[in-house]
């Protein structure tokens, strides 16, 4: 890292960190201060800061606000919750909402409990809210595991009327994934038909149930699907006047083309035509236009990691401004893998695949193979009845030959997958679980259009992302709820985003540009809605106005658009340290996309860049000033500044004094022990010599003593106080240097305690060892 010529110094009166004991490991926390991928949100707003752009709606003891329906004509949001349906004026204004209590009779609840269901499950969870016509809504609920549907007069909004069975339209419980859409006043639903949830079905529910058009029960049609979304596209959106309305269903199902112990899941899209009447003999009351294809959103493991479809949103441009586009969230089916990918799919690419080769499952090898073109009958199976087909005397699906219907019954799956629009995901993240997505198109100040996506997470956060080229850049992470909970539904209404969850409906202002306080902040936000106004000296939602406004979505070149702002140097914090301590200096830029560098004293020799800052090993050369400088959009500024100082005046010399005293004591101890041993040895030698001289004088016989003589035997001498302190025999048996026990050595680096600082000056201490 380059050395800095400018070294910030602590000024008088500036705060300093409290000194901490000698040889402690100081750890200062801080976020990432380096270049990161655009899948990481540029900025994050905690709940305390996010509340300014949020409006909440909740009713005590009412839960599961999971079904949202926006009626732009009446500026009303309809909310389906547990046992209740609300009608709220948009945007939220604090006005008292209208409500309908759609409760389950006690007899139904008792019957539900007798079937072994829990008390909390035996409620009416609203699953469908749809606009039936200008005066009525269609609604369906689980009704304590006995689905019911009815209509609501929106002018009176008092009760659910004309109740009828909801089987085949609505799931039996909210845990069963389902999807439904109204097209031409007709409900198209994808759900399960039986109580156990083992009979999946896609229906056109109009008239009597026995007259419905539905999917066949063959597992080749639907095999344990989890439905995600249903979308209706009209010929006008295609620019095809000869076409028919098409209904697309998105789901994940278990593949039958793999021989594996694991149930391999595959994301797929299916399409049916609104004019389908079924077959005359073969496929009676069954879809004759049901075709499905794999959706490929490659992940880190070449597609396996993105095998579960979580949600799909359709972005519909204005008529004549382009064709719709589907945005899908994909995740992994394997436990422990937190992977989310976002892919875009064009309807024309789906159409191309549906017009391509069919796949045939070979039962002997469980592998799918393409059907040869010569084996495909004419007219082509699965096609909608168009004017061109009518000219060929096929006025409806009832007039199709049996060979065509038999083929489509046995070959509903296409051989080729649908690839994403750019051939790869727009975003892949391994640390965030996305559950819901909505999208809209925004016109920037330059007139160029950008797709803005809102991604709801598993823990209740909202990520706002803009599509720039072939990738998504996540601009902001917004915490929605005080307590983490999944985002269950999202709808857009003009500049407001409406979010449904278990405990509330949250309204988010998507044009909250005023919180960006400077020109550089406004430009770096890269929000197509926001622009900096030199006239007002604030960040505003431009609304197509151009006078005195600047914006740069793709480059965010602050240096050329904004006047140079006066640099505000941060407070320099003094950090008291001791020799050999490890100190981590945090750097906390406001943007995770900023590139940061450290300027440090030229004498520092041991430093390590980390995700949370800079780690420095304290040496005399490491003393001095440190500065973290971050750059984004061509503008650089110092984010954090520190000054390493000795913990106290005695810290640096006391270390050398302590080590020197220890070494001196060590050598003095060896010298004293040696002198003591020499003196003891000489004393014993002199005593032995005196004994030998005394024996010579009395004619002592060194052999066996004769009878009548007295033998003299010497008992072992009792140990002296010196021997008790240092027994010679024990010392010689020791394993130390020279046969003696090793002396006590002063550990120059005792085990350091850990001090965790949440910032500077010292905030909290957690000492594990001192």
Swiss-Prot record:
It comes from the Eukaryota. GO terms for molecular function: chemorepellent activity; neuropilin binding; semaphorin receptor binding. Residues 580-635 form the Ig-like C2-type domain. Disulfide bonds join 112-122, 140-149, 273-384, 297-343, 513-530, 522-539, 587-628. Residues 1-34 form the signal peptide. Residues 42-510 form the Sema domain. Residues 681-770 are cytoplasmic. Pfam families: PSI, Sema, Sema4F_C. Glycans are attached at residues 64, 133, 509. The modification Phosphoserine is found at residues 718, 720. It is a single-pass type I membrane protein. A motif (PDZ-binding) lies at residues 768-770. SMART domains: PSI, Sema. Belongs to the semaphorin family. Probable cell surface receptor that regulates oligodendroglial precursor cell migration. Might also regulate differentiation of oligodendroglial precursor cells. Has growth cone collapse activity against retinal ganglion-cell axons. PANTHER family: SEMAPHORIN (PTHR11036), SEMAPHORIN-4F (PTHR11036:SF72). Interacts (via PDZ-binding motif) with DLG4/SAP90 (via PDZ domain 2); this interaction may promote translocation of DLG4/SAP90 to the membrane. This is Semaphorin-4F.
